[in-house]
Amino acid sequence: MLDIQLLRKDLDGVAQRLADRGYTLDVAAFSALEAERRAIQTRTEELQARRNSLSKQIGAMKGKGEDTSAVMAEVGGIGDEMKAGEAKLGEIQARLSDLMLGMPNVAHESVPVGKDEADNVEARRWGTPRQFDFEVKDHVDVGTPLGLDFETGAKLAGARFTMLRGSIARLHRALAQFMIDTHTLQHGYTETYTPYIVNPEILYGTGQLPKFADDMFRVEKGGEENKVTQYLISTSEISLTNTVRESIVDASALPIKLTAHSPCFRSEAGSYGRDTRGMIRQHQFDKVEMVQVVAPEASYAALDEMVGHAEAILQKLGLPYRVITLCTGDMGFSAAKTFDLEVWLPAQNTYREISSCSNTEAFQARRMQARFRNAQGKPELVHTLNGSGLAVGRTLVAVLENYQNADGSVTVPEALRPYMGGIERIDAPAQAS
């Protein structure tokens, strides 16, 4: 959530910055609500002053034995008006809160202004795409003989679900273990196991609700009278970031660096018809997430560090990639600045997103009321960052395509062999005669 003081000081400036993100701020609605709020607060202050004056007058009159009934009646009327004003103020503040909850974060000044992904800016590349001396297959054709089972996944749960078997399932698990070990043993993160089902207020904290309810899988339990609504997480960023919800941490505890391997559940409501083949876009997929909670002055250094941690995974796996700075129109709702990592997929002859690393500054912290005690001993909002380190399924796709061989086998990257029992190559299971 944005700082409402920012809007009060420079409403037109904030409106322009939000317009750069493709969001139209209802300036008239905000201004009208603010005018009502100020009018009620001014009237309340006047009534409070009048009531205090009358209270003193009543005391003096009683001391003289004078009749105070008329003055007391006026005091009662003031109380009724103040109570009505308080109720009206609560209504206005609720409407302001709803308006604020729908506003995305404002972009950092270093973010390129643009409309969509066509305006993103490439920052750098690593690695050289492999030159194949045979016809390259995509991950579906490579993986199906080795244990990718789309047919059974669809039979069990419908479209965009996949079953993994045998060595492919083991390779998928090896990738997640390798990522977690790298982040915990080399990058300083604490491994965390989190709930996969969370309460609605948790999603308000990280910005998925109220705007993106249709992208979430909802879980309901209980009857009509005691129904409880919860949600499956779309990323473990949600549960990791909310660990500091409604708390004040000591400055000495920062930075907090957490990582988790979890399934992620997304309805992909706005992705009908996109990436329908294979594992690129799934309703259920695994991801290793990185989250950092830091002091405000450290957040952009932390963002660069987090991008480097995601890059390290790709480099250790020998997968070519590029780093993209997202423009204002392509960033996620909560982000102030985002870098995407895109891995090379030879069958598509292009780079595809495999990680997204974002600094949300105080946007999520304000929604969560997550604070730290600064050097002056005063509570101050933390900054929160999140990044994929990496999406496990898409990394599996990249390994299958980049490490495929002409005979249909797949070479296991050296970094994964300790997690695969020393296996250097995955071959299709022998067919029974």
UniProtKB/Swiss-Prot annotation:
Pfam families per the UniProt record, alphabetical: Seryl_tRNA_N, tRNA-synt_2b
Alphabetically ordered keywords of this record: Aminoacyl-tRNA synthetase, ATP-binding, Cytoplasm, Ligase, Nucleotide-binding, Protein biosynthesis
Subunit structure: Homodimer. The tRNA molecule binds across the dimer.
GO BP term (any one): selenocysteine biosynthetic process
Organism: Burkholderia lata (strain ATCC 17760 / DSM 23089 / LMG 22485 / NCIMB 9086 / R18194 / 383)
GO molecular function: ATP binding; serine-tRNA ligase activity
Keyword Nucleotide-binding: yes
HAMAP family (UniProt xref): Ser_tRNA_synth_type1
Catalytic activity line of the entry: tRNA(Ser) + L-serine + ATP = L-seryl-tRNA(Ser) + AMP + diphosphate + H(+); tRNA(Sec) + L-serine + ATP = L-seryl-tRNA(Sec) + AMP + diphosphate + H(+)
Residues engaged in binding ATP: R266, S267, E268, E353, I354, S355, S356
Cellular location(s): Cytoplasm
Domain notes: Consists of two distinct domains, a catalytic core and a N-terminal extension that is involved in tRNA binding.
Descriptive protein name: Serine--tRNA ligase
Gene assigned in the entry: serS
Keyword Oxidoreductase listed: no
GO CC terms of this entry: cytoplasm
Pathway, per record: Aminoacyl-tRNA biosynthesis; selenocysteinyl-tRNA(Sec) biosynthesis; L-seryl-tRNA(Sec) from L-serine and tRNA(Sec): step 1/1
Protein task: Catalyzes the attachment of serine to tRNA(Ser). Is also able to aminoacylate tRNA(Sec) with serine, to form the misacylated tRNA L-seryl-tRNA(Sec), which will be further converted into selenocysteinyl-tRNA(Sec).
